[in-house]
From Swiss-Prot:
Disulfide bridge partners, by residue number: none
Tissue: Expressed in young seedlings, mostly in roots.
Transmembrane is among the record's keywords: no
Pfam families xrefs: SBP56
Keywords associated with the record: Selenium
Protein name: Selenium-binding protein 3
Induction: Slightly induced in roots by cadmium.
PANTHER family reported for this sequence: METHANETHIOL OXIDASE
SUPFAM superfamilies reported for this sequence: 3-carboxy-cis,cis-mucoante lactonizing enzyme
Top-level taxon of origin: Eukaryota
Family as reported in the entry's similarity comment: Belongs to the selenium-binding protein family.
Length: 480
């Protein structure tokens, strides 16, 4: 991955960062390092969040361990998602390089810029964008998802105003030096709610999703807040790069809390998916002949009838998904049920389940919660121990190797929600797993030799969230 970062990766070494096509990216070098956002915010420990560097090179003496920790200079940040200053969208520009990891803090509003180029094994803080300046110039707060643009600018979704109102959501545009340029969207074209976004330049479109009002989700999840309209069920279709809101797709009850959104990687394709957490659906969106966009439910995870839980039925809660670089497979996490699913999406209209594995969840054997079968017979899922450790929480964030053969998994969603649904996760910390993927016939299996225990960190148990490779990946790089 260091070779990729330095643009010495075979076919991609003659131009800008990344790869010319998604398929060329699949032939990139195997990952050796992975950066993980690690969180102390909300755990009761007065320690700063940090960026953990994990060794994922099997031949290394420090394989499957944290080899470096970069603490942030402030407390109570809540690191969450991340992105790059430049990626494959800048492939045609030799003046660009993938050097800085952009780390927004969901609660404090600080946007950290991390230098990963000087020493990839020991990243350092380059600067941070002051939330007071962002607020003064744009009115935006709660920064969430950054994406690099072909222009060299960085676009960051923001989820509300300083009071946590969703009406204040929008998109922050930073220049290549991380100075504030302003809002990206045109005046009066802000989304109803904010969260994730993905753009497909050949179709002159960006689509963004809807978590909810920060004033609601930062207090924990309350089902009443959904009925009170404090959570989203919409996809926002923008003209790219003009920033005009062209359409709002109302997903209804089959699309509650749409979080992650991904177009297919092939830039000519005018379709993609959004993962809707509460409805536990993958909604496919697609362009019509008249240039408008429509949607349909492509995947639906049925709720479990349960005993000894807060509700009689438990949703899967799809909190993350990703798509392999060849657009063959989609992987999604059911954070509450505890399983990871692999679908063949060669025909995006009709995904086929090809793999499933349980790596935690509220219904694993030994837990208090029981699932009920069709005839009312109680059951629980078998979840293996890894290196003698019982798996805590449920599968949450993913990262897939470039070749599609290794899926990395962490288990923290958001510290307040972790404490609400998985208190043991806050007490004992997260862990990181690696799933081996059969890319021929389909199928998933746990790598028993890989287990990173964030419960044994020097400053106490921490929560592990999003992951990034130094050389880019299938959830950061966009092809133009």
């Amino acid at each position: 991955m260091e070779a990729a970062m330095n643009n010495h990766d075979g076919d991609c070494c003659k131009s800008g960062p990344g790869y010319a096509t998604p398929l060329l990216a699949m032939s990139g070098p195997r990952e050796k390092l992975i950066y993980v956002a690690a969180i102390y915010t909300g755990t009761g420990q007065a320690k700063p969040d940090y960026l953990a560097t994990v060794d994922v090179e099997p031949s290394s003496s420090t394989y499957s361990s944290v080899i470096h920790r970069l603490p942030m200079p402030y407390l109570e940040d809540e690191l969450h998602h991340s992105g790059w200053n430049s990626c494959s969208s800048c492939y045609g520009d030799s003046s660009c390089e993938r050097r800085y990891l952009i780390l927004p803090s969901l609660l404090s509003g600080r946007i950290y810029v991390i230098d990963t180029k000087t020493n990839p094994r020991e990243p350092s803080l380059h600067k941070f964008v002051d939330p007071a300046e962002v607020l003064e110039k744009t009115g935006l707060a709660y920064p969430h998802q950054p994406h690099c643009l072909a222009s060299g600018d960085v676009l960051v979704s923001c989820l509300g105003d300083e009071d946590g109102n969703a009406e204040g959501s929008g998109f922050l545009l930073l220049d290549s030096e991380f100075n504030i340029k302003g809002r990206w969207e045109k005046d009066g074209n802000s989304p109803l709610y904010g969260y994730d976004f993905w753009y497909q330049p050949r179709h002159k479109t960006m689509i963004s999703t809807s978590w909810g009002a920060p004033a609601a989700f930062t207090k924990g999840f309350d089902l009443k807040d959904v009925s009170d309209g404090l959570y989203g069920k919409h996809l926002h279709v923008y003209s790219w790069p003009q920033g005009e809101l062209k359409q709002i797709l109302d997903l209804g009850d089959t699309g509650l809390l749409p979080l992650e959104v991904r177009f297919l990687h092939e830039p000519d394709k005018a379709t993609g998916f959004a993962g809707c957490a509460l409805s536990s659906t993958l909604v496919r969106f697609f362009k019509n002949d008249d240039e408008t966009w429509s949607h349909e439910v492509a995947i639906s995870v049925e709720p479990l009838k349960v005993e000894n839980w807060i509700l009689p039925e438990m949703p899967g809660l799809i909190t993350d998904f990703l798509i392999s670089l060849d657009d063959r497979f989609l992987y999604c996490s059911n954070w509450l049920h505890g399983d990871i699913r692999q679908y063949n999406i060669e025909d995006p209209k009709t995904p086929v389940l090809t793999g499933q594995i349980h790596v935690g969840g509220l219904v694993q054997k030994g837990s208090l919660v029981l699932a009920l079968g069709e005839e009312g017979k109680a059951f629980q899922f078998d979840v293996p121990k890894i290196k003698g450790q019982r798996l805590r929480g449920g599968p949450q964030m993913f990262q897939l190797s470039l070749d599609g053969k290794r899926l990395y998994v962490t288990n923290s969603l958001f510290s307040v929600w972790d404490r609400q649904f998985y208190p043991e996760l806050v007490e004992k910390g997260s862990h990181m797993l690696q799933i081996d993927v059969d890319t021929d016939k389909g199928g998933l299996s746990i790598n028993p030799n890989f287990f990173v225990d964030f419960g044994t960190e020097p400053d106490g148990p921490s929560l592990a969230h999003e992951m990034r490779y130094p050389g880019g990946d299938c959830t950061s790089d966009i092809w133009v």
